[in-house]
């Protein structure tokens, strides 16, 4: 909502005070008026732009002794009504007033007002506009609009102040470059995005149905057949190829809005822009891009069913060749209404971070996995891109983009039996250099094995779906920390909050490999608070004795881990079972912690109770058989 402050300026005797009085009284006041009227505040009335709350009108004097007050009021205003009434005061507009405004460093729109039109009956409206106003508008871009008024006849008085309000609420300057006679680049970019979002079937045209939906969204009234024909005819006059049986293309849509701006109907363009959440500087509203969304400690964010449905539909619409994957051109088209790929995707080497087909194109599985990971690691990024990409909530109680997300239950006590209430989990893959961490991530994404060793410097991430026993699926994020490993492991609070499982890897064929793991756990003792899975990689090579205080199986037994290290090779077909094991450890964390003595004693007690129950049941059966046998003899 806007508060409009109008500063009325001009030479002495041009009728500034009479215009203000005529506005307030509704008629011309013949009595003598004081030289400078006090400030007045006008509440919204019929015809006031809907986003204006109050309008303040300030009268000023052009006398030299009042110059400091004049400068102060000009700086406080957000629009200037500049009044002239004869040839002398008209000449002063260009020679004094407009240069004076510039010297003050103000950047506000100016509405030029030719007052006392009742005294210039020999000049027609068109002549005044052509000879006086248009040359000034061409020279001074700060002039938003012009109008002829008469305070005596109460002619166009209300309209003059309405133009001032509109100059604030619907400014022309951000939209149109009158010198170039073209829409400004930022306006074109915004309108291109609006066209893209309104083109629901992504065929490059706004069909009649899409135009009707667009009309209802922006103006809340239906588009008549007459208006539809008129729009197409208007575009066809200058861009014949922009109108086709399929509808109007983006070029025609941009041209239509350019015509609105040229003809002073820029209010129409602003209504369109604001319907799509644009601000006065043509950026998207901050509250729209970044709505309030809190994730409590030990909880996480995930896509809701509506969020997944949106990204599925977006993928299907963007897969133009129907090959089941998004190629570079299709991805570029999909992200056209956004600033580009999310920064985290570029840092994570997308699309190599997710599932691709043989041609290297991102599959639907990989697309959803990537967004699941983004939502988990940075829900604000997902919300921002949902806004850019045109997500529309079907939930009337929550019309914002947050309807596409949900928050999981906090998981604080991981050692308590039971599954965590989340479908996306994160595992850090730790191990010495050369242990096979990168090969593990490649295998997770079904990539071929490479014998060439490339040490990981930058962090690397992989995300994919894992099918758990029973048929339930979850998204598993595995990352290799690279040079950031010390910083991430030292941040205990963040590590325990975000990480769901630690995967310790070592090369079973390298005698110096395993010693890294006990040293790491000793250096960062809080790692013991996270579920753990030990994996012996390169099991296709000869296993060797480790030069460590304890052998791997002895170390895990000493920790009372539920199982010994898993011996696997990325060249084996059974490799996928490792990822199921890792996902299960994250989803049911109590199964991946060292078993305490109470757990072991409890297990033996359970066995004892079970055995005792069997013995008792057997003895009871014998007694019953004997009784039955005895009664039968």
UniProtKB/Swiss-Prot annotation:
Q: What is its EC number?
A: 3.6.5.-
MF terms from GO for this chain are: calcium ion binding; GTP binding; GTPase activity
Q: Which GO terms describe its biological process?
A: heme transport; mitochondrion inheritance; mitochondrion organization; mitochondrion-endoplasmic reticulum membrane tethering; phospholipid homeostasis; regulation of mitochondrion organization
Coiled-coil intervals: none
Enumerate the residues binding GTP 2. Answer: 431-438, 467-471, 537-540
Residues on Cytoplasmic side: 1-603
Return the PROSITE patterns for the record: EF_HAND_1 (PS00018), EF_HAND_2 (PS50222), MIRO (PS51423)
> How would you classify this enzyme at the top EC level?
hydrolase
Which family does the UniProt entry place this protein in?
Belongs to the mitochondrial Rho GTPase family.
Instruction: Name the chain's protein.
Output: Mitochondrial Rho GTPase 1
Whose protein is this, by species?
Answer: Aspergillus oryzae (strain ATCC 42149 / RIB 40)
The gene that this protein is the product of is gem1
